[in-house]
């Protein structure tokens, strides 16, 4: 889990940043690109049995600011999103899946539902297009704080 989630994210970011750094600046500030990493609410609220997953996502959170500082010299911004419960195919389909998702949604502060992939994509777009957003971790989770189990 750590190899794929953390080391894989670091390796992809390193390659992408190297390619971005080799390009001409996109604007008068000297920006050459932006990276948005994906962590998880588990980085902050890991549940029982999730130690390696939480550590892998916590590592992504932890590397965000130092890498943003490193890449500032070449005009590359770095931010991270820590999604909560997002409605994806991982939950399956059908009546039983819908009931499970509704149950999970009740643990969200507001709105009492799972987030949508579109809502997550909106945040990705915000982080990519706002030139003053750098070195930040943004939770897109409806205010949920996961219980231990």
Residue ranges and their predicted role:
Residues 1-11, 36, 60:
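Catalytic Tyr-X3-Lys loop
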Residues 72, 77, 134-136:
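Short, small/polar-rich loop/turn modules that mediate ligand/substrate recognition or access, typified
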Residues 40:
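Residue(s) in the substrate-gating loop at a strand-loop-helix junction
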Residues 116-140, 145:
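C-terminal substrate-recognition "lid" of short-chain dehydrogenase/reductases
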Residues 45-51, 74, 112:
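Active-site loop immediately N-terminal to the catalytic Tyr-X3-Lys motif
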Residues 18, 69-70:
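Alpha-helical segment proximal to the catalytic Tyr-Lys
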Residues 13, 56, 64:
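Active-site helix of classical SDR
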Residues 98-118:
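Catalytic Tyr-x(3-8)-Lys segment
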